[in-house]
Amino acid sequence: MYDIKTFNAIAPVGLARFNEENFTINKTETPAGIILRSEKLHDYAFPASVLAVARAGAGTNNVPVKQCTEDGIVVFNTPGANANAVKELVIACLLLSVRPILKGSNWVQTLTGTDTEEQAEAQKKQFAGTELEGKKLGVIGLGAIGAMVANDAYRLGMEVTGFDPFVSVDTAWSISRRVKRAQSMEEVLKTCDFITVHVPLSENTHHLIGKEQLAQMKNNAVLLNFARGELVETEAVIEALAQGEISNFVTDFADERLLHNEKILVLPHLGASTEEAEVNCAKMAARTLKKFLETGNIKRSVNFPTVEMAFNSPFRFTIVHRNVPNMLGQISTGIANLDINIDTMINRSRDDYAYTIVDIAETDEAKINAAAEKIQAAENIIRVRTIKNAEAVSY
């Protein structure tokens, strides 16, 4: 039985994925898994029981990923589950950036008298805008969201250029061939009328858009940030707007320094705030966490490699270890020395860590436990789990 601890309100349809036969929700102080949205876990004391954390959303900067990795805790996210919601908001804000819709609507609310229609017609010219068709959009980051923004902007008649040196094969196939691929971020900054940023936050992308990058942009360019606030250097943007280096800034991340500036549109982090996105993220997070706890298979992890193998044997070892030479030999020898036969084995690595799954043709739990203890005691081993396949075990 696995207990799942929740932070924030998780959509019930997602939690329903955890069947009552194998899972409980918030019943103990020693959960096997954690599922959350925006709760910050950097000061959270993780119980030793925690095997995995599933973030119902794309970003994981609210989770101490490095600490989790060192402790053998797998961290999952839900890439693409909220992509459509964010994409729609980006498209809406592209339109808002060229058409003063909000100003016009607010102005109409101030009209008095019985001739409001005549007043509106007489003054509407002050709210004239421009069109997106034919304008150039630069998309920095072509993940699930960036790819969708690029495709839909092209359908609106924009000339779209994308830049992402690490675009995945799957995403690359989904991007319209009409979207031009830039060879550098500088190319995007210098040539586009609108720049929208869609990259994850990391040490390498912190202040990805700063003073130097803003100086490269057109002086009538509009910058949009719906990824993470820290990707854009706030003070540099304010200065660039004041000096006329760029035209406008649209962001989904509130900062008191950005308020009360007519050149800046600030939203209260609405990107994924749709009913559909909340449900999609909860379902994906629950599904991924459930599969990992029941089988040890890893998919959509931000700190460990994708490792999946059909579970047909009576028992399975999953082993988190350092990515150093001779680990597989050490593991397999330790198992074989106890007269346990290995059915199948798979190993994948990611940076300094690796993950190994070993399926064994053994049902003697005393021998299995002894093997697990022996593996755990070996050098460079971080965590060992033993998973019983109820459907395969027959006594």
Region roles according to the model:
Residues 142-143:
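Glycine-rich Rossmann-fold phosphate-binding loop(s) that bind the pyrophosphate
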Residues 299, 303-395:
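A conserved regulatory-domain signal marking ACT and ACT-like small-molecule sensing domains
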Residues 42-44, 165-258, 273:
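Rossmann-like adenosine-cofactor binding region
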Residues 146-147:
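N-terminal Rossmann-fold NAD(P) dinucleotide-binding loop
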Residues 79-136, 300-302:
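Phosphate-binding beta-alpha-beta segment of Rossmann-like dinucleotide-binding domains, i.e.
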Residues 161, 219-311, 338, 355-362, ...:
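Rossmann-like dinucleotide-binding domain for NAD(H)/NADP(H)
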Residues 1-78, 210-212, 233, 345, ...:
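An N-terminal-biased, well-structured beta-alpha scaffold segment characteristic
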